[in-house]
Design a protein with these regions (language model features):
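Short amphipathic alpha-helical segments
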Residues: 1, 89, 160-164
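Residues that scaffold the ATP/ADP-binding catalytic core of kinase and kinase-like folds
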Residues: 70-71, 100-101, 154
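Mechanotransmission and gating elements of multispan inner-membrane complexes involved in transport
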Residues: 115-191
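Cytochrome P450 core scaffold surrounding the K-helix E-X-X-R motif
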Residues: 67-75
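Hydrophobic, regular-secondary-structure patches
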Residues: 1-59, 82-87
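Structural motif
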Residues: 34-37, 101, 159
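Hydrophobic secondary-structure segments that place a key small or acidic residue at a functional site
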Residues: 42-45, 58-64, 77-149
């Protein structure tokens, strides 16, 4: 994406408690703004990704599969299996992480993360739907993608979101310091 919307401070340390409580208000504004070509709502958390053979720390992204296709290259990076369909407990994993965990498509993965507001640990079981390769070791070794609803459930955050990623009609808009979409938002401090 060419731009991000999140609560002020979130990008500095990815604090799961700094999330947009009602992203639908922002999404309505984005839908009405002709400068915005597409956007995708995400939740994101650090966590443990485990298989029967190994565990690694990494980032868990909960994404809206349809929206994400318009703002990122995840679907194009799939090298085995399939992209997310929206079915419960699907997971995309990088080829490097899949090697570390000794998993392939169809195998089970346990995700462990901290719930928002309580920091209580939570776990859920997922199946590897697809394996991606971006060609960037950090991305391929440290990130998994799950469906947005599963991410919200895992983190116990209902309709919330950590980030909205933007794609603009004109890429130059991403450098426009006068992009005032988010001004006058009295309820949340956005950046």
């Amino acid at each position: 994406g060419e731009g991000h919307i999140n609560l002020k401070g979130f990008r500095q340390n990815l604090d799961v408690d700094l999330y947009l409580k009602n992203p639908s208000t922002i999404m309505g504004k984005l839908n009405d703004d002709e400068r915005v070509a597409a956007f995708s709502v995400r939740v994101l958390s650090g966590g443990m990704i485990g298989s029967p053979y190994n565990s690694v720390g990494g980032l868990i992204y909960g994404v809206n599969a349809e929206q994400e296709k318009k703002v990122s290259k995840i679907k194009d990076a799939i090298v085995a299996g399939d992209y997310l369909t929206g079915e419960k407990r699907e997971l995309l994993i990088g080829d490097e992480m899949a090697d570390l965990l000794e998993v392939k498509t169809g195998d089970r993965i346990v995700l462990t993360a901290a719930k928002v507001n309580s920091n209580e640990l939570t776990q859920d079981l997922f199946r590897v739907k697809g394996i991606f390769e971006f060609g960037n070791r950090e991305l391929d070794e440290e990130i998994v993608f799950i469906n947005l609803a599963d991410g919200q459930a895992l983190l116990d955050m209902k309709e919330g979101a950590h980030q909205i990623v933007l794609q603009f009609q004109n890429e130059a808009t991403s450098r426009d310091n006068d992009f005032v979409l988010l001004e006058n938002n009295p309820t949340q401090d956005l950046e």
